[in-house]
A protein has these predicted regions:
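Flexible phosphate/Mg2+-sensing switch loops adjacent to catalytic phosphate-binding sites
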Residues: 1, 63-64
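S-adenosyl-L-methionine
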Residues: 1-31
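Conserved proline-anchored active-site loop of SAM-dependent methyltransferases
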Residues: 7, 34-56, 91, 100-105
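Soluble or luminal CAZymes and related metallo-dependent hydrolases
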Residues: 22, 80, 84, 113
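Asp/Glu-centered strand-loop micro-motifs enriched in Gly/Pro and often flanked by an aromatic residue
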Residues: 27-32, 73-75, 439-440
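Amphipathic alpha-helical transducer elements in NTP-driven molecular machines
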Residues: 36, 40, 78, 82-85, ...
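Sequence-level detector for compositionally biased, low-complexity segments
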Residues: 53-62, 71-72, 90-603
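Glycine-rich S-adenosyl-L-methionine
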Residues: 66-91
């Protein structure tokens, strides 16, 4: 018999007066099941809802077990599917043995904030079987051979089939065993595999689930001892944190100061109703309301409050920045970004990285940055650390030059670096390191930044430590000697200047813009020139060089001689050369825009 009830609510001792007679009888029967009936099997496809409305005390108390000792600001553990896993675990634990079997959101099998959840499941169950069905369109998931990977449902979130088995055989002090199977490809292929397979016939991979992650996917941690001797990038900086989150990007971020100023004047002069109508702002959110935004602009607007803003790699736009939380900008990150209102520079790095391409992260900025400036997929956002700190002398945010500043580095870590390479850290040198570095006996804050930047872009580093770079802030090796340190400082400094569009080498343009026209971006496309493959060796293998092509912005105008590698290059999940142009569809490129489009492939 089937009863209508809310599974995530505890049984009610008295329901007879709450409902009509027929519903009261059904509720009482359901309460009897919840309270007295042993549950040996829980099966289902629980709902996925990050903003869960199921916030009853009973399930919130149960789910708290998954949140203990995480030391995370954002937990992401209140999704309904997680509550249903905890609900099922509760009833199987209560019975002493049984089976919990769900097809669900698969984020819990390798999520960083889910590590205590996985540990609790390992403590409860003897064996856990996970068929990872992948299909996560949010991170553009593909198969290992580059072919398409489809979801088994018409959703974007990846899914997995999870079977948790509890017997009375496992000791309480032991952790359960995890068996994993990965299934990728087209939807029909996955259906066929699932329809013709049983738990006994699947080729399971037994995982070694260990502290601190307890991952339910295969991880290659053979380099862990060496990697853990490196310093954690997040620990190097005294001040760091996520990028700025506007809550209304289309409204708050503009390509020109004039466009932004028009919006701000509307917020001053128009009523709330007129603002909502003109800018299609029908629904407020928790951190952004038209009333709050209007009050902020009226109280603080001035020309100096319009700031340059790194929205995406190489894409600098403009933002209104008063530093007021829940104002025109929802989450401005004032403690970090007031330091960027004067002359400064900062490094961008991820907390975790998802997607198919592994760690392709790291960027640099002289401006306030967006929460997604350095990562397209993670959901954890982009972290930013300014190199220098300024005294917070004014809440007016009026930019002043020559204000005294100091570095933003952990001196204890810096002293360890200095001791290893026999150099002295010059705490008073706050320059940007443009002088000759080959004969220096001291190093400066910018040298440390450049050293780190070179490491983050090292192909060897990215490949060797790719599993670790997926799950936490990057760790950076201590330099082994002066010679290596200065070599990497030089490489990192050159790359920094190129990425900031400050290097004179950018004037050596590698592309052309040969056709005069409207300069309006319409349909952006890349057409490779007609090449023949070059025979590489006697085995008949072919070498496909870095072909050049033309990037068309409309039917007639194009950028010529763009390398394929530059067009397809990734930074943080973005392809900057493509995204910069595609984001300007419908706009006319000015001279500076045309130069930017030619600089970006080189950078």
């Amino acid at each position: 018999k089937i009863y209508l009830t809310n599974s995530l609510e505890e049984y009610h001792p008295d329901t007879g007066t709450l409902f009509a007679n027929w519903l009261s009888a059904e509720a009482n029967e359901a309460n009897h099941i919840k309270r007295d009936t042993p549950v040996m099997v829980v099966v289902g496809n629980p709902p996925y809802a990050v903003s869960s409305t199921n916030k009853g005390a009973w399930i919130q108390n149960l789910i708290a077990d998954y949140k203990k000792d995480l030391n995370e600001k954002k937990l992401n553990l209140d999704d309904d599917y997680i509550k249903f896993i905890r609900y099922g675990q509760h009833y199987i634990d209560k019975n002493g043995c049984g089976i919990l079997a769900y097809i669900s959101n698969n984020s819990f099998i390798d999520g960083i904030t889910h590590r205590q959840m996985r540990r609790r499941l390992l403590e409860s169950f003897d064996k856990i079987y996970v068929v990872d069905l992948h299909g996560n369109a949010k991170i553009q998931e593909i198969c290992s051979d580059g072919s398409v990977d489809q979801n088994v449902f018409d959703i974007m979130q990846g899914v997995s089939i999870n079977i948790f088995i509890k017997t009375l055989l496992k000791k309480k002090t032991e952790l359960g065993q995890v068996f994993h199977h990965s299934l990728q490809g087209k939807r029909e292929f996955k259906y066929d595999q699932l329809n013709t397979s049983g738990i006994e016939s699947i080729n399971w991979e037994k995982l070694k689930c260990t502290d601190p992650g307890y991952f339910f996917v295969q991880k290659d941690f053979k380099e862990i001892e060496k990697y853990e001797t490196f310093f954690r990038l997040h620990d190097l900086f005294l001040i760091s944190g996520p990028g700025c989150k506007t809550e209304r990007d289309g409204l708050n971020i503009k390509f020109t100061k004039e466009e932004l100023r028009t919006v701000l004047l509307d917020f001053i002069n128009l009523s709330e109703e007129e603002i909502r109508s003109k800018y299609n702002l029908h629904k407020d959110s928790r951190d952004w309301k038209v009333k709050w935004a209007k009050n902020d602009v009226i109280a603080n607007f001035s020309n100096t409050i319009i700031q340059s803003y790194l929205y995406r790699p190489f894409d600098v736009r403009y933002i209104y920045y008063s530093g007021i939380s829940k104002g025109f900008v929802g989450t401005p990150g004032y403690k970090r970004f007031y330091n960027m209102l004067n002359d400064n520079i900062g490094i961008i790095f991820p907390r975790i990285c998802k997607g198919n391409n592994g760690f392709q992260h790291g960027f640099i900025s002289r401006n306030i940055i967006d929460v997604a400036a350095g990562d397209a997929f993670s959901g954890a956002g982009t972290f930013f650390a300014p190199l220098y700190r300024y005294p917070d002398k004014s809440e007016s945010l009026i930019v002043e030059q020559n204000i005294e500043r100091q570095h933003n580095l952990n001196v204890e870590l810096i002293n360890q670096v200095a001791g290893r390479i026999g150099l002295t850290f010059n705490i008073d040198d706050l320059s940007y390191g443009l002088e000759d570095i080959t004969s220096k006996l001291t190093f400066t804050p910018i040298d440390i930044l450049d050293y780190i930047y070179a490491i983050l872009y090292s192909p060897t580093y990215r490949e060797k430590y790719k599993e670790f770079l997926k799950i936490d802030f990057p760790r950076v090796p201590y330099p082994k000697d002066q010679r290596t340190f200065w070599q990497l400082v030089q490489l990192g400094g050159d790359l920094r200047q190129i990425h900031l569009m400050e290097s004179p080498i950018l004037n050596m343009l590698i592309t052309k813009y040969p056709v005069v026209g409207s300069n309006e971006v319409d349909k952006v496309r890349f057409e490779t020139y007609d090449y023949e493959a070059t025979l590489l060796n006697e085995n008949g293998e072919f070498d496909y060089p870095d072909y050049l092509g033309a990037v068309y912005i409309n039917d007639t105008q194009y950028f010529a001689d763009v390398p394929t590698s530059a067009w397809e290059f990734y930074i943080g999940g973005y392809q900057p050369a493509q995204k910069w142009l595609k984001d300007r569809k419908g706009r006319k490129l000015g001279m500076q825009d045309i130069l930017q489009s030619q600089y970006t492939p080189f950078a």
